[in-house]
């Protein structure tokens, strides 16, 4: 969708913007300056970055300076599934949902993918940023990608040892259950927590929420 929309921008001269915040214009405000932008969590998807190592044959060797277990951090079982395991579009959707429901693999693959993509931009294409910024988890990706921080291995160890994304705000979401005083058996077959983009005035949303128990 992004590829089609960007192409259309050159045809009709209009900007492209999505509800999630993606933006493209053929008329940038500045000239010749380049910024690397690093997105937040949950931005990787099945098949993303599958051509990076082809673009830059030396990428794997350089990646070892960022992690001694780069393959593990990329989570190839999600990013690069073997074709015999995916036989239909429905199976692909199921794998993507499983990926989305696995915060730690999603975060680790997102950060390590950002590191690799930055390496390709700088070493294979010779593009150096004049500035960089990251949103949420993107701050972590930015600091690792640009060499401000060293090895990603300690980050992975802390992430996997912490209960935060295993059961506090993911999985059974025990933090939410404790705050709302819910039982373990509540919300077993329905969504406990969701977020939405609402195109409405804050006052209208606040008023509508007054009728809700939670």
PLM features per residue range, with description:
Residues 1-15:
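Helix-enriched interaction subdomains in cytosolic or periplasmic regions
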Residues 1, 209-214:
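Short, intrinsically disordered, charge-balanced linker/junction segments flanking boundaries
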Residues 18-210:
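FabD-like malonyl-/acyl-CoA
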């Amino acid at each position: 969708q992004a590829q089609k929309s960007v192409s259309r921008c050159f045809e009709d001269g209009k900007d492209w913007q999505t509800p999630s915040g993606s933006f493209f214009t053929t008329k940038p405000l500045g000239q010749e300056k380049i910024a690397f932008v690093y997105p937040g969590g949950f931005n990787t998807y099945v098949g993303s970055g599958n051509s990076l190592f082809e673009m830059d044959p030396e990428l794997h060797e350089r990646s070892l300076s960022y992690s001694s277990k780069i393959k593990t951090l990329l989570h190839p079982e999600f990013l690069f599934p073997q074709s015999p395991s995916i036989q239909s579009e429905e199976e692909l959707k199921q794998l993507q949902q499983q990926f989305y429901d696995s915060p730690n693999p999603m975060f680790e693959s997102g950060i390590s993918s950002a590191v690799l993509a930055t390496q390709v931009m700088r070493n294979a294409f010779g593009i150096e940023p004049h500035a960089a910024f990251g949103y949420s988890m993107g701050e972590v990706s930015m600091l690792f990608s640009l060499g401000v921080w060293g090895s990603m291995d300690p980050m992975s160890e802390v992430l996997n040892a912490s209960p935060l994304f295993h059961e506090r705000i993911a999985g059974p979401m025990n933090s939410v259950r404790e705050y709302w005083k819910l039982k373990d058996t509540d919300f077993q077959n329905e969504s406990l927590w969701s977020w939405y983009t609402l195109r409405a005035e804050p006052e209208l949303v606040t008023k509508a929420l007054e009728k809700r128990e939670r």
